[in-house]
Amino acid sequence: QKVLDNLSLEIQKGEVIALIGSSGAGKSTFLRSLNYLEQPDSGKIEIDNFMVDFSTISPDEILTLRRKLAMVFQQFNLFSRRTALENVKEGLLVVKKLSDQEATKIAKEELAKVGLSDRENHYPRHLSGGQKQRVALARALAMNPDVLLLDEPTSALDPELVGEVEKSIADAAKSGQTMILVSHDMSFVAQVADRVLFLDKGKIIESGTPDEIIHHPKEERTKEFFASYKRTYI
């Protein structure tokens, strides 16, 4: 069984695309395939002048790909024995080979953008779930990725913590960060996305603006999804 079935998309610089659909539709698998965390047996990706064929990808190409595509997961994935500042600096030091002074400057700037300047010397155990996820977001943005991949970034959070993370993501979108977002929060999708793709069984069934897809879907499968969504969440 194919998890992804000839799925293809093009994203413009500064655009935010949201992937929605039922559980098992292939949304997270697609995101993880883009930066080769899942290993597709075929397909290509092109970012500016960098192009790679997944069927022949080399270790060097994987590293380049992951420099261009930063990912924020459902879970926080922070180093427990490093402070918020050290977590954000890590990729800058190891991947980008910046000096400690340069990495510290960028890390402080990114933590400030997500409202965590006063938590930069705190360890993850002393941070709330929302604060941990904002550190993860700052760490991804610090890498200055061509595209930011967000896989259900608020689904593991308590409801009262969701807003602070969504605000930080929305701020990044307003600043021109290109993003591909997987989310089940349709109000947030409507707020932040330029374009919404509805996936079913590894295929894009319908594409349009948030208003078109959420409020005026054309395809029967999309209509069924939103009828079920309204029963579940409203």
Cite the ranges covered by each PLM segment.
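Catalytic Walker B motif of ABC-type/P-loop ATPase nucleotide-binding domains
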Residues: 148-151
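ABC ATPase NBD coupling module
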Residues: 52-70, 174, 216-217
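Conserved ABC ATPase signature
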Residues: 123-127, 131
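Helix N-cap at the start of a conserved alpha-helix in ABC-type nucleotide-binding domains
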Residues: 159-161
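A short, proline-enriched helix->beta-strand linker immediately N-terminal to the Walker B motif
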Residues: 142-146
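A short, surface-exposed alpha-helical micro-motif characterized by mixed small hydrophobic
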Residues: 189-191
